C-alpha cells in the first residue's frame, strides 16, 4: 500500500462523509500486515474514533473480509468471535465501516472509517474504495 494511495482513500472517505452530512469522521488505512499507512481525524471527531477506525481496518486484513461481512459471521457463530477476540487481544471490531483494498484480487490493505452510525461509516468507506 503506497502512502499516496492511502491518503487519497482517506480524503475520499472524508469527502463522502461531508457529502452525506455525516458526523465528524476518522479514517485509517493499514497495509496487508495491519500497520498504519495513513490516518486522519476531522475536527470534532471524538477521541475514540481513530481507534475504532483502526480496529475496523485491522479486522479486515486479519480475517480477509470487510467488517460488514464480519458482523454477519459473528451473528452466525458467536463462539468463533469470542475465541478470535481473545486470540487477538480484543483487536477485532465487528462493526461495518472497514473495507479491504484489493488490486488484482490481492489484498493490499484496508480502510476503516468511524464517527457516525456503522452504516454511514460503511457507505463512506465503500465510496472511497469505489465499489
Walk through the language-model features, giving the residues of each.
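Flexible, solvent-exposed loop/hinge segments and secondary-structure transition points
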Residues: 1-131
Amino acid at each position: 500500500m503506497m502512502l499516496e494511495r492511502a491518503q487519497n482513500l482517506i480524503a475520499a472517505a472524508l469527502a463522502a462523509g461531508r457529502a452525506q452530512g455525516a458526523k465528524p469522521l476518522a479514517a485509517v488505512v493499514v497495509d496487508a500486515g495491519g500497520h498504519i499507512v495513513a490516518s486522519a481525524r476531522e475536527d470534532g471527531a471524538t477521541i475514540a474514533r481513530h481507534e475504532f477506525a483502526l480496529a475496523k481496518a485491522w479486522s479486515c486484513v486479519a480475517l480477509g473480509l470487510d467488517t460488514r461481512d464480519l458482523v454477519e459471521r459473528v451473528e452466525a457463530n458467536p463462539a468463533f468471535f469470542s475465541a478470535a477476540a481473545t486470540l487477538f487481544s480484543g483487536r477485532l471490531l465487528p462493526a461495518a465501516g472497514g473495507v479491504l483494498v484489493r488490486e488484482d484480487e490481492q489484498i493490499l490493505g484496508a480502510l476503516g472509517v468511524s464517527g457516525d452510525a456503522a452504516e454511514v461509516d460503511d457507505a463512506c468507506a465503500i465510496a472511497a474504495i469505489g465499489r
